[in-house]
Structure formats: structure tokens, C-alpha cells
Amino acid sequence: MILKKKVAGLTENALRNFVLRARRAVGVRGQVNVLVTGSAAVRSLNRQFRRQNKPTDVLSFPFVSSLSDPRQSAKVAGDVAISADIARQNAFCLGHSALEEVKILALHGILHLAGFDHERDNGQMARKEARLRQLLGLPAGLIERAHPENRRSSKVRRATGARRTA
């Protein structure tokens, strides 16, 4: 875990513990490395690896081994890069903490490492993420807002910053 940009309440140890819980919940066995950094660094990664010259909230990089030993591939699942700046913006719009948003984005990235793709799976990833967020005690995120069928009305926090009424 590397925290290049601070997020209130987030420590490397807390992030490591959350990622372990999320990995287990998703069923990812290999190590997941997480970088929390600024928008400029994430934009650079997005440009370099996805040919998109814009910042984004989270990027996932599955580990692909060119080694003939499959045990090496099983040791590392991949890397996740999170923009602390965009996490703060998302959190403000959704009415929860930046700490919670970083966890939501880490979970989202881990789901991508497990092979899920919300751009092509007709909502399968969104439904899985919604279930896992509930299991891990996290609020609704942007992907849930993009797929209204996954919303639980009493738990959704509106973009106006309204608080949950649980």
C-alpha cells in the first residue's frame, strides 16, 4: 500500500486491512497493491496504459506473468491506482467520507482484477459490487447510482450531500 496523497482517516495499515477483507469477499487470492495518489499521476497512468488523456477515479492493472510457473501468477493479482482528489469529489457529491470513497474505489478495482467489466456485463459487476459494499459496510458509490436497479432507497445518499436516513 502506498499513500502518496493523504486522505482523512486513512492509514496504510487500515487500507491494507480493508483490501484483505475485500479480496476475500471477492475471492481474489493473489496480493493486491494499492496506490492512492493525485489526479495528475492517475491521469498519466490512464494516458500511458489506456490512451485516455484524462484523470479517472480508479485504474486496475491485472498481473500477467510471462513466466511458465503458474504459481507466480497466483501470488499477485495486480495493482490498483486511486485518485485521492477524485475520491474526495465523489465523496462530497455522494454525501459520505473520502475514506469510505477510497474503500469503495479499492473494492471496484479489486472486482476488475477478478475479471469483472461493468462496461460489458449488463450490470453484473454493479450488482456484485452493491452486495459486497453492503457486506463490507460501505455506502452507495457511483456505480450504484449509474445502475438504479441496485439502489436501496433507505441507504442511498443523494448527490446533494443529504445524509443517509437508515
Residue ranges and their predicted role:
Residues 1-102, 111-166:
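An acidic/histidine-cluster motif and surrounding catalytic segment
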